[in-house]
Regions:
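Positively charged n-region of N-terminal signal peptides that target proteins for export
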Residues: 1-4
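Outer-membrane beta-barrel pore domains
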Residues: 24-30, 65-72, 108-110, 119-123, ...
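Inter-helical turn/loop segments and adjacent helix faces that build the functional surface
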Residues: 194-198
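Generic detector of N-terminal low-structure segments
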Residues: 16-18, 281
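N-terminal periplasmic/intermembrane-space "pro-region" immediately following the signal or transit peptide
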Residues: 18-58, 377
Length: 377
């Protein structure tokens, strides 16, 4: 524990020492570098007016420990995500996007894992957007946030317990805004196949979201409130055993912002076949400068079923295997530095997690630290 705390303090102190105000020529350099992903652009070409590369590369060092006897700890460097693909604008208003998840840690296995975003989309004149294909299914605060734009190192434990652990599903969605009310509706296959061969063979689910910014009512820059609804049906196929425990889930998301202060929340509930789950996430953060940000996040989940809550990615990967309980609490402290917005950033996080089993005994209690670079294009 002492080594972990010292390491965290050293890294956080070092990151504070690197805080600088970016100059205009630095921004210009970043602009020139990122402009290189556009391989073709010609607005007069009615067939294909633009073609550019997309992707993300996320590397990190993490150190986690479980103090519950027998105590165990683990630290390692890891390529968290590597995705690569393209986007093309066709026939003026149609977008074709395809991206693959590639495993740089796939030792002895193929580099290719699966497709993530692979869809076509188009918009009407009034701003209604349709999307068909494999796409992100947005639900809960962090579940509706791209991994490129997370303010924490990982999605919250609400996203992993109230919502599916998987993000991309084959389906169709429509989104837009009407009379200042944002809306989203999606219908998806709940399969976990790498491409499209399992689409709608095991079951399906739907998502409906409505949101509105009430900034004028509260005299703030942003006061956004959103309700998410998810309903699912499946045939109990073992191929989708990660998802067939859900009947429905609901989420109330708020985003309060003013000047350099932010306060985002998520209150969620899942109707699961083996016990209901509710969760609360409170996430205030503050911009120290236009490039540097401090963040705190409190998350708590409680389950009426025995031992169906799970820890995060690295907590679960300690040598003793997966940890399960029915009462889960996490405190997260973070420091982010944005060199080029979310496209190039350095993130640091220190977290404390406690997971209790149904009988009251501790399943997991310990600290974790992660420092990471996130690049996207």
């Amino acid at each position: 524990m002492k080594k972990l705390t010292v390491l965290a303090c050293m890294c956080l102190s070092f990151s504070f020492s690197q805080i600088i105000n970016a100059q205009e020529d630095q921004e210009s350099t970043f602009d020139k570098i990122w402009d290189n992903v556009v391989l073709y652009e010609n607005v007069e070409n009615s067939l294909m007016s633009k073609f550019w590369l997309t992707g993300r590369l996320q590397g990190e060092y993490h150190s986690f420990e479980n103090e519950v006897a027998p105590a165990i700890d683990h630290d390692d460097y890891d390529w968290r995500r590597f995705r690569f693909g393209f986007k093309a604008t066709l026939f003026g208003d149609i977008t074709l996007h395809s991206e693959a998840d590639l495993g740089l840690e796939n030792r002895g296995r193929p580099l290719y894992n699966d497709l993530t975003d692979t869809y076509i989309s188009w918009s009407t004149e009034n701003g209604m957007k349709f999307k068909l294909g494999k796409q992100s299914a947005p639900f809960t605060l962090d579940g509706s946030t791209s991994s490129k734009k997370l303010h924490t190192l990982e999605r919250s434990k609400i996203a992993g317990n109230i919502w599916f652990g998987q993000e991309y599903f084959p389906g169709i969605s429509v989104s837009g805004s009407k009379d200042e009310i944002d809306y989203f509706a999606g219908f998806y296959s709940n399969d976990n196949k790498p491409e499209f061969d399992g689409a709608f063979k095991h079951g399906q689910f739907g998502i409906l979201s409505v949101g509105k910014d009430y900034a004028g009512n509260f005299d703030l820059e942003k006061s956004y409130l959103r309700l998410d609804f998810m309903f699912q049906e499946d045939d109990g196929n073992d191929d989708v055993e990660d998802f067939n425990d859900w009947n429905a889930a609901y989420s109330f998301v708020t985003k309060w912002e003013n000047n350099d202060w932010y306060f985002w929340t998520d209150l969620s509930f899942a109707d699961r076949k083996n016990g209901d789950v509710w969760g609360l996430q409170l996430m205030p953060f503050y911009d120290i400068t236009d490039k540097t940000q401090v963040i705190f996040c409190y998350t708590h989940l409680d389950s009426s079923g025995d031992n169906q809550l799970r820890g995060s990615r690295w907590e679960d990967r300690l040598d003793r295997g997966e940890y399960r309980g029915d009462d889960l609490t996490e405190y997260f402290f973070g420091l982010n530095h944005f060199f080029y917005g979310h496209k190039l950033k350095w993130q640091n996080g220190l977290q404390y997690t406690q997971l209790d089993e149904a009988d009251g005994s501790k399943e997991y209690e310990g600290w974790g630290f992660t420092t990471a670079f996130r690049i996207s294009w």
